Amino acid sequence: MPTKALGETLNEYVVVGRKIPTEKEPVTPIWKMQIFATNHVIAKSRFWYFVSMLRRVKKANGEILSIKQVFEKNPGTVKNYGVWLKYDSRTGHHNMYREYRDTTVAGAVTQCYRDMGARHRAQADRIHILKVQTVKAEDTKRAGIKMFHDAKIRFPLPHRVTKRKNLSVFTTARQNTHFA
């Protein structure tokens, strides 16, 4: 299932659906879910996947009332996000909490999918995002996120290779790339 972002960030959708009313059950409960997907078609598909697992209702016996893409209110500021997830690996089910810094919730979740694929070889359709929440700077737990909260943060000079134009491709001396 193409849950992963193919080059771009995932979008955040709020999908609202319910079981189709019947004579036996004229008033049915409404379910609302926050889904991260590349487009609205995949968001609907993931909605029915989760509803069939949680409420035992198939797509044939249900209907989607609304689907809306959610946009970040102020995407210009960097925030800390905590992501609670569960995923299935070759050995079993795992629960996990991860932290990311990003400007949007969808960007943080995209980072999470890519990070889980890289570190744990978890496939995108086996990852279930349970909750995403902004985390205050003093409440962050991970050292990789805490190091960016220093006001006097300094970044090292990068290890650059300068491209000189009028030089031959092959040379007898190795170039110096350390500029410290």
Curated annotation (Swiss-Prot):
Which Pfam family is an annotated match for this chain, by its short name? Ribosomal_L18A
Q: Which GO terms describe its biological process?
A: cytoplasmic translation
**Which GO terms of the cellular component aspect does the record hold?**
cytosolic large ribosomal subunit
A GO molecular-function annotation: structural constituent of ribosome
UniProt key word Lipoprotein = no
Q: Which domain of life is it from?
A: Eukaryota
Q: Does the keyword Ribosomal protein apply?
A: yes
Q: Which InterPro entries match?
A: Ribosomal_eL20 (IPR028877), Ribosomal_eL20_dom (IPR023573), Ribosomal_eL20_eukaryotes (IPR021138)
The entry assigns this protein to a family as follows: Belongs to the eukaryotic ribosomal protein eL20 family.
Q: What is this protein called?
A: Large ribosomal subunit protein eL20
UniProt organism field: Caenorhabditis elegans
